[in-house]
Amino acid sequence: MSQQATDRSSMFLSLRHRNLRIYFFGLLLSNVGTWLQFTAMSLLIYSINNKATDAGINTFAQFIPMLVLGAWAGGFADRHNRRRVTFWCQSLLGVQAVVLAVVTFTGHVSLPVIYLLSFGTGIASAIDNPSRRGLVTELVEPSEIPNAMSLNTTVMTGSRIFGPALAAVLIGPLGTAWLFALNAVSYLFVIGSLLMIDKTKMLPATSAARGGKPVREGLSFVWRDPMLRRAFIVFTVVSTFAFNYSVVMPKLSDVRWGQANGYPILLTCVSIGSVFGALGTARFTRITMRWYATLVIINGVSCIAIAWAPNFLVACLLCLPLGLGGTGLVASMNGLSQQNTPPEMRSRMLALVAVAFLGSTPIGGPVTGWIGDNIGIEWSIAYGGILTLLFVPMLWKDR
């Protein structure tokens, strides 16, 4: 067998498990709907007052529960049936999507209503996140977990291509309400996939003992590992200040490049790059710090370059490495958090990654929106890239 064929087979190694294929199929279709809603909601919020700050406030409302509950949710997932927790959380998220569609159809949608629903979504997502991702580790052999986690990221980011692209096509003729309704329907697929999983072929992790202090135990585990500690610190900085471009991209597209409806196209380009970042990471049976540092650099440089892109076409092209670096970094951080972690700690590690990735958004989102409205729309994305590059030297000793 050629080396190229070997690399390709190893890239998709964990898909030999039927349970994982079923689960990924449901996640893919459901997440397409999620990105339909995300794209439509961003455009809806910007259309109300033409302010990036409003999107920043919505980001705060949606992700503050992750900051508060995320680490605790990891301990909760380690102590309970992950499949069951994921089922109920996905059901609640589907109900939220139905409510959002109804209030939009009936003309009762407003910024306070959007913020309230986003807050509710945030609570369910904070609990769902470590259980949903931790469930992946129960569907494959232990040696296949890094590959499965990278493919999970590929599935989630691959849906980002179709979601925003569909939104760009459908939002004109259908409007935002129908996109919210389509998202509600999409939850049926992931709920169905959870019901179809063959429980007799699962490899459930040993539940962590009840009691103790799961959040403190998870943080202590990270702090005792110098490489993991530095990776988490850098990841938190990048997530806080360089991953919130969706807050300002609608205004950046409108003000700098004169493309009022260009946001879905930019987001689609980011998503295309994201697939390559996730698949590139899936090649590794073990994540290396050299690869991790490379992705950090790509992400930082891309943010700075996009900020001063001379036209919309160049901006779209630069969104490709932005997606590659960002999603590759997330997939790598997921892999690093799992490859040396005992089974009873895995959900806690995933929860800490989620807190760093999404829980930092309530801080970075409003800051990014404020910079875009008060200092300069270009600086709202460039500052994150600059801060990212300043922290790269922290990773050098682990290369």
Residue ranges and their predicted role:
Residues 2-21, 199-233:
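Juxtamembrane intracellular "pre-TM" segments in multi-pass secondary transporters
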Residues 21-38, 61-75, 81-96, 113-172, ...:
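Substrate-agnostic recognition of the 12-TM MFS/MFS-like secondary transporter fold
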Residues 24, 55-59, 86-87, 115, ...:
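Hydrophobic/aromatic positions within or immediately flanking transmembrane alpha-helices
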Residues 24, 28, 36-40, 173-181, ...:
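A single, central transmembrane helix in multi-pass transporters
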Residues 36, 40-64:
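Extracellular/periplasmic helix-loop-helix junction of adjacent transmembrane segments
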Residues 49, 81, 103-104, 108, ...:
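Helix-breaking motifs and short loop linkers at transmembrane-helix boundaries and internal kinks
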Residues 68-72, 79, 85, 89-92, ...:
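C-terminal transmembrane bundle of multi-pass solute transporters/carriers
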Residues 111-118, 122, 147-204, 245, ...:
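Hydrophobic alpha-helical transmembrane segments
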